[in-house]
Amino acid sequence: MGQITFLISLLIGAFLFGISFRANAISFAPWLGLAFLLHATRGISPSRGLPVTAFVLYIALAFVQRGILPVPDPLYFIMIAGITLVAVAPFVVDRLIATRNSGWITTLIFPLAWVTFDFAQTRLAPGGSWESIAYSQYGNLPLMQLAAFTGTWGITFLIAWFASILNWGWEQKFLWSTIRVPALTFVGVCSLVLIAGGIRIVRAHKDGQSVRAAAVSFPAGIFQPGERTRIAEGRIDATDRAVIEEKLSRLHQSFLERTRVESRGGAKLVAWPETNLLVLQEDEPSFLEHARKVAVEERIYLAMGLGTVHVGNAKPLENKIVMIDPAGQTIFSYEKSHPVPGWEESIMVTGDGRLPVVATDLGRVGSAICFDADFPEYLRQLGRARTDLMVLPVNDWAAIKYQHFAMTAFRAIENGIPILRAASSGVSGAFDAWGRVVALTDHFSGTEVMVAEIPIGSVTTLYSVIGDLFAWLCVAGLIAGSVVLMLA
C-alpha cells in the first residue's frame, strides 16, 4: 500500500471512528470507520503504520471528546492518551496475530481483541462504559435487544467483525468465490440477531400495570452562576450564610410546591434529579419532615435527589437519593458509589456500593445515581433482584445530554427494567424494559417537568443472569486463537 492510500484510509477511518462517540453519531460510522482503520494498519509495516495510527486517533479523540470528559486540561490529555492506547491495542493484535494466516477465520481475531480491550477498560478505567462503540447503535431497537443476552459486548463484536470481514474482502479484491463463505456467515448471524430482536419487541408486553410519574427539575432564577457549585463544595462563610440559607429555603419550597402540583395532576411517583435539592446537614431533618408531609398528604412516592452539605468536611457532599412512601416512611436512602472523576470525586462521600431494591405497591423499586448506571456489571444488581422500576436521578451537562440519555436505554434492555430518568441540565425520560422511549424532556428547552405513564414490571434477561460471560468468552477466544495462530 502506498503512503497516500494509507493516509487516506487512516484519515477516513479516524474521522468515522471519532464521530462514533458523539450523541448525534451516524450509526454506520463505527462499522465503516474500523474497516478503514484496519485497511490502513494492514497495508503498511507495523513499525511505521501503528505509531502513525495511534497519533491520528489521539488527535481525533481529543477533538471529539472535548466537553465530554469533565477534567482540567493536563488530566484530559492524559486520559485521552489512555483511551487511545485501548483503541489502538486491537489493531496491534490484529496486525501481529491475524496476519499469520490468510484464512477468513482470522477475521475473528479483531472483534475478539476489540471486545477484550473494551471489556478491560469498562472494568478497570474510571470512565466505565463511556467509550463503548455499542452506544452508537442507539435507535436500532432490534439490534439493541442483543444487549439482553450478551450485554453491549455482542453489539460491539458484530461491529468489529463486520469491519474485519469487510477489510478481508477488500484484501481479496472482493472476489465472490473467495469471500462468499465469510460474507454469508456474517449476513446469516446478523439476520438472526435482527429477526430475534424484532420478535422480542413485537412480543413485548403492551398491557399490565403502569404508573404516572413526574420528574421535577431544578428551577431557574434562584442562584447566581457558580453559586450552587460553591454551596456543594461547602464554601459558605458567616458573611453570606444567611443569604445562602434563604435561597436554599426558596429552592426547597419550589420543589415541594411543584411536587404537589404534579401529584394533583395524577402523578403517583415524583422524582427529583441528582443533588438538585441542596440542603445543609443541620437542616436536613427539618426538610425531610416537610417532604414526608407532602408524600402523606398527596399519597405519593417521592424520590428525592439530595445533596447534603457538611460545611467544614474534607469531602462535604453527600450525593444521595431518599425515597419516601405514601405513609411517610423512608423506604431507602442510597449514596452514589461512582463519583465522576475530577471535581465531583474530590468533594463527594462515596457510597457502600449496594443498590437498594424495596417492595412497594408499585412493585419492586430500585435506584442508582447518574454515573453509577454507566457501569453495567454494577447495575446488574437490579436485574438480578428482578426490579420492576428503577428511579435514576441524573445531573448532566449540555455536551453529553443526549449521549448519556441514550446509554440509559441499554441498561433498561440488559436488565429488563423500566427506568424513570430524572435529569437536570440534561434529558429527563422514561424507558420501558425493551429500551423504548416512553417520554422525554430536554431541560435546556426551559421545561422543568416531565410526565410519563411508565409500564411497570421486570422482564427476565439472560444478561441479568450470566452477566459479562460473553465478554469473558471473547477474552478466552482471543487467547486461544492467538496461541493457535502463533504455533501454526
What does each model-found stretch correspond to?
Residues 1-204, 398, 411, 428-434, ...:
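Membrane-embedded alpha-helical bundles of multi-pass enzymes
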Residues 18-21, 92, 215, 321-323, ...:
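Conserved hydrophobic/aromatic beta-strand scaffold that supports enzyme active sites
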Residues 68-75, 120-150, 312-381:
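Active-site catalytic loop in hydrolytic enzyme cores
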Residues 86, 112, 269, 276-277, ...:
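CN hydrolase (nitrilase-like) catalytic-core segments centered on the catalytic cysteine
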Residues 90, 94, 256-260, 355, ...:
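Generic structural signal for well-ordered alpha-helices
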Residues 197-345, 358:
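Soluble catalytic regions of membrane-associated enzymes that act on cell-envelope
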Residues 219-220, 251-256, 345-351, 369-375, ...:
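A general structural motif
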Residues 348-365, 392, 453-474:
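Short, solvent-exposed cationic patches
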